[in-house]
Amino acid sequence: MGRCTIADVAMLIRWRVSLMVAGATFFGAMLAVPHVTITHLLASLATFLLAGGCSAINQVQEADLDAVIPRTASRPIPCGRIGHMYGSLMGLALVTVGWMVLCLAGGLTSLLVGIGIVAVYNGLYTPLKRRTSFALLVGAAAGAMPPVVGWLAVGGHPASPMLVVVYTLYLLWQIPHFWLHAARDREAYRKARLPLPLLSLPHERYARLLKVWFHAYAVAVLMVPAFPLLEWVGMRIMVTLCGIALLFAAMLAVRKRRVALHIADAVLCAVMVVLLIDRLAIPVSLF
């Protein structure tokens, strides 16, 4: 193992992604209980630790793949700056502490959810990536859980329509988001022999499937104003416009990949903000 720096550790835990996971957890908690408590903060910290631990373990599992993909080749394990043993120990330590904090925040139910997320992401999704082009469906199921973790940790009802809609939004957003990102490194993925739909399906079939996912994502967004989830008419109009923007992005998904990706990501952020503002009942003079 070469010299390990703080920057290497940050790259190992993918701190930006882990921070976004923590933010999604905090968002879910605020939707359930719209005022900050220690439980909100503990649940967010727990998912940050879990995400960082999952990332470290994932990079150990996929070190050979990371080495042949330009975007990931500079990660510390493929470069030899962090060894497999050190990466594994750090990942397990972060996951274990994350589980402890999550149990402290939300009790046994939250702990079991946290264990399930790690089991699905590192135990199922990561190995399946080498075997099937639709492994992302498994990964997305785990990736959509952070808002659920936050919601449940603060005592939100598990069968709430709001929770179902938010989980569905996160789930459906991940598919086009990842596929559009993967198009940037298609030749590297081909070299790594990963069976992505972009590579394993005929172009026309892949394009149709990508549009289907965009349309499904748009329908999920349009469900928000269709059901009584928002109090303010202005907020319903804004979310409806977001759904229309996704339908537009579906038409651009193949020809204007970057534009479609930005729209997909921006819509998720916009809907999160709208839901939170509506839940907090923040006065906005425009509406």
Curated annotation (Swiss-Prot):
Pfam family, one: UbiA
Pathway: Porphyrin-containing compound metabolism; heme O biosynthesis; heme O from protoheme: step 1/1
Catalytic activity: heme b + (2E,6E)-farnesyl diphosphate + H2O = Fe(II)-heme o + diphosphate
Membrane topology: Multi-pass membrane protein
Other remarks in the entry: Carbon 2 of the heme B porphyrin ring is defined according to the Fischer nomenclature.
Biological source species: Nitratidesulfovibrio vulgaris (strain ATCC 29579 / DSM 644 / CCUG 34227 / NCIMB 8303 / VKM B-1760 / Hildenborough) (Desulfovibrio vulgaris)
Disulfide pattern: none
Protein name: Protoheme IX farnesyltransferase
UniProt-listed InterPro entries: Protohaem_IX_farnesylTrfase, UbiA_prenyltransferase, UbiA_sf
Entry's EC annotation: 2.5.1.141
An example Gene Ontology biological process: heme O biosynthetic process
MF terms in GO: protoheme IX farnesyltransferase activity
Intracellular or extracellular location(s): Cell inner membrane
GO cellular component, one term: plasma membrane
HAMAP family for this protein: CyoE_CtaB (MF_00154)
Superkingdom of this protein's organism: Bacteria
